[in-house]
């Protein structure tokens, strides 16, 4: 966002099963929504969309995929980022069932539903025509799938500041802070960056690019 890129967030579940404090159960949904909004603000994002699915039980159902298709056709992004639909056995905590379901729902939406005018025809009738997503970037997946590393050294403090806002999800904030910074430095080394740099790691998939058979 610092470079002027327009960014939108889609939050699929309400996070109602998250957190660690029993006393917060009644207000956890509102608490997590507020944390998300503030964390997004820190990152320069104001366009948030909540799908209000149940935490821990997300499925890539016809209805959920339809919600994602509708949102994509409204926003028409050049790049879609999503959790990876494949389980990461190197660190299984990356592969929460909701993360896997999110990745699968987004994948089904990106291809073929969002570009198929006959999928969810009610959307086209409502003025949301089909369009082709150029790129899908996955994160949080198996390390061997990662093929693109982005240097974020100048933005690490902003990232960690935003993560810290999700206080209900971090029983040990300082340990989380150190863990994130270490992981980002490891990503940079894996990506061939200079020692001391930090990077995000992605599995980039071209959907409709010069290298793909667009529309086939």
Which residues does each PLM region occupy?
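Metal-dependent de-N-acetylase/amidase catalytic core
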Residues: 62-216
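Active-site rim/loop-helix segments in enzyme catalytic domains that contact anionic ligands
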Residues: 1-76, 203, 215
């Amino acid at each position: 966002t610092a470079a002027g890129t327009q960014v939108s967030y889609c939050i699929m579940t309400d996070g109602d099963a998250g957190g660690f404090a029993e006393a917060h159960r009644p207000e956890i949904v509102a608490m997590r929504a507020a944390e998300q909004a503030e964390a997004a603000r820190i990152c320069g994002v104001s366009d948030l969309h909540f799908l209000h699915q149940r935490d821990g039980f997300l499925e890539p159902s016809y209805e959920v995929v339809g919600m994602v298709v509708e949102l994509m056709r409204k926003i028409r992004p050049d790049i879609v980022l999503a959790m990876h639909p494949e389980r990461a056995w190197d660190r299984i905590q990356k592969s929460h069932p909701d993360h896997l379901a999110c990745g699968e729902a987004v994948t089904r939406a990106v291809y073929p539903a969002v570009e198929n005018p006959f999928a969810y025809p009610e959307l086209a009738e409502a003025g949301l025509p089909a369009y082709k997503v150029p790129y899908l970037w996955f994160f949080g997946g198996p390390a061997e799938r990662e093929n693109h590393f982005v240097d974020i050294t100048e933005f690490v403090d902003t990232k960690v500041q935003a993560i810290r806002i999700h206080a209900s999800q971090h029983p040990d904030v300082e340990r989380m802070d150190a863990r994130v910074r270490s992981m980002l430095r490891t990503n940079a080394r894996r990506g061939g960056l200079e020692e001391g740099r930090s990077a995000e790691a992605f599995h980039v998939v071209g959907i409709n690019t010069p290298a793909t058979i667009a529309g086939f």
